[in-house]
């Protein structure tokens, strides 16, 4: 209140955003549409785990009008905590749905958490974005002034060879999994996952 008075803003009403869910996405699937679908379908009291890195940039915008939920995010400087965070959240709060948004590179650090989810029957829906790259590390190379990485460095940040098939990896660990390239298929799969913990 004192700061608002000092700035001459004491009588200014705060700008409040309407609590409105985004529309159901349609068409070819991309990262913002995944975040939009999560915002559209997010159940009340859910726990969101965000380690989608560059793929999850729109998550906060798309879920701000969703029902009340908790968000656990990456603190920076390391990757690989998202799937284990989802396990921990599901164990700590078995009555709440957990939705984990995970990048493909970070998933590879702790992919075995999927097996734990299946073994323990945890209420976790894991969404793995597959852009076949450690995209955030390419950004970090630029931030530290490595203007043009050489072919060896670039190859270390590429996840194309061999191609990762996350749905097959998950199925091999006992997790029901699907892969989709269409927003409609993604929404249908997310609805199914939330209805069948």
Locate each region found by the language model.
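Thiamine diphosphate
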Residues: 1, 57-197
